[in-house]
A protein has these predicted regions:
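Bacterial N-terminal signal peptides that target proteins for export
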Residues: 1-8
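Early exported N-terminus immediately downstream of N-terminal targeting peptides
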Residues: 24-105
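Low-complexity, intrinsically disordered terminal/linker segments enriched in charged
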Residues: 162-213
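Surface-exposed, polar/charged faces of alpha-helical domains
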Residues: 25, 40, 44-55, 84-88, ...
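Bacterial N-terminal signal peptides
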Residues: 9-16
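Surface-exposed, charged secondary-structure patches
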Residues: 103-145, 197-213
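Sec/Tat signal peptide C-region and signal peptidase I cleavage site
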Residues: 17-23
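Short beta-strand edge/turn micro-motifs at domain boundaries
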Residues: 144-172
């Protein structure tokens, strides 16, 4: 989907964490510090800019994906249907959704150019374990774009489980797609649809690897 591609392209500008500090650092400070490193790498690395598949995916795998709570994200996107899925179905669904976002994050990273990120003051108490980190993406042309994250703290530190661009949450956007596929073919039908989409994306250059209608 074109809208989801925009979601991920913007979110990738700031979506990154670091394991060594994940449990100790404030969530907004953590995102700000590490996102700067990822953004600078994406801008300066010619191989990434050219869409070098292995290099881009390696960056996504090491800097972004370990600190996204994919199981929680998948469960929320699946809604009430998640409870009806078997453990094996839940595992397969989470794996395919994760792979879909791997391709999408990677495609977005290869297109990062002149964007910068500005973070807003964190509205949370020190003891809070579920917060919203607010930011905006500044572009050379056009108005700033609001970009917020829902971040929860668990045993292994802070992890993102939802993203908001222009007032719409990513999980809610996928929820409609998931429900439509489930209504047609059940949980297995959704897993197959995601698997087929991932196979299709794997055969394309990174700069086109994003879900489309």
């Amino acid at each position: 989907m074109k809208f989801i591609k925009q979601f991920i392209a913007l979110a990738t500008v700031a979506l990154a964490f670091n394991a060594a500090h994940a449990a100790d650092e404030a969530p907004d400070a953590l995102v700000k510090r590490i996102s700067s490193d990822v953004l600078n790498t994406a801008k300066s690395d010619k191989a990434i800019q050219a869409g070098d598949t292995k290099k881009v995916i390696d960056l996504v795998e090491t800097k972004i994906l370990p600190y996204v709570d994919f199981q929680r994200m998948t469960a929320l996107a699946s809604g009430r249907f998640w409870r009806d899925a078997t453990p094996d179905q839940q595992k397969a669904l989470t794996e395919q959704f994760r792979q879909l976002l791997v391709f999408t994050y990677s495609g977005a990273l290869s297109q990062v150019k002149d964007q910068t990120v500005e973070f807003k003051p964190l509205r949370a108490d020190p003891t809070d374990t579920d917060v919203e980190v607010r930011s905006q993406v500044n572009q050379a042309r056009g108005e700033p774009i609001p970009l917020n994250y829902r971040v929860a703290k668990g045993p292994n530190g802070w992890k993102i489980y939802d993203i908001n661009v222009l007032g719409a949450w990513l999980v809610e956007t996928y929820k409609g797609t998931f429900a439509s596929e489930i209504s047609k073919g059940g949980i297995d039908g959704l897993i197959k649809a995601l698997t087929d989409k991932n196979k299709s994306l794997a055969a394309k250059p990174l700069n086109t690897a994003a879900p489309k209608k």
